[in-house]
Amino acid sequence: LTSKGELFHQETLRLLGELEGFEQYAAALKGELRGTLNLGVIDSTVSDKALPFAQAIGDYSQEHPAVHLHLSVMSPYELQLGVQDNRLDLAIGAFSTRMSGLVYQPLYREQHWLYCSTRHPLFAERRIPEPVITQQRMVGRGYWSQAELARHGFKHSAATVDSMEAQLILVLSGAYIGYLPEHYAEPWVEKGDLRVLLPATFGYQAPFSMIVRRGRSREPLIQTFRDLLKAQLNQP
């Protein structure tokens, strides 16, 4: 697209989003919700007990059966772009960088540890100096900047992935070490296939947020889902 064509495309998306928002608001005045709710989330959250995402979706669908749900799994960067250009109404993830025009509502923090597998030379070692670990071949994430990588104790990565499943595969290969969410790695830890490396040094917590485009928080479809998710999060 030319620069003018791109501007026209973006303006069309904005107007279509506003039109759908008006239709949803009119339906809400009649006491009903209808339309399409486009949700986005990062991968590997299904095993995270701290995020009652499936429960909130179940409640939402039961209370508002006329709403069509569309759920996408994307990287943090793609989620932010999707919300920014109205392809997504709401998204949940860990966002190390923020984009203008979006509202970020903190939810909780997800624990990550640095892992190696039984096939890795360090697996059987008990006292491993920190410099030895930082010299290992490490898996980075495609959405991590060099500064983000350095914050986790590494100067460079030997492999790059765009999903947690891909990261798990490379760590299980024994050729690399890498960070994984605790809840996601737990089944392999329990089977003895993975172990944590120096948790006091390399563990970190990823802050999760729910994001919407600025000015859209009060749209009925979005606000209703936000309220249901917050209610689930507040349950003991």
Segments (PLM) and residue ranges:
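Basic, amphipathic "hinge/linker" alpha-helix immediately C-terminal to the N-terminal HTH DNA-binding motif
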Residues: L1-L19, A26-L29
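Short amphipathic alpha-helical coupling segments at ligand-binding clamshell hinges
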Residues: K4-E11, P52, S217-A231
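N-terminal winged-helix
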Residues: E32-E63
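Short, well-ordered beta-strand segments
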Residues: T36-I42, A91, V139, G178, ...
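Short helices/loops that flank or line small-molecule/ion binding pockets
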Residues: S72, Y77-R87, M164-A175
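Short beta-strand-centered segments that line the small-molecule binding cleft or hinge
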Residues: Y77-H112
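C-terminal regulatory
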Residues: Y104-A175, L180-Q205, Q223, A231-P236
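A bilobed periplasmic-binding-protein/Venus flytrap-type ligand-binding module shared by bacterial periplasmic
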Residues: Y115-R119, P207-R218
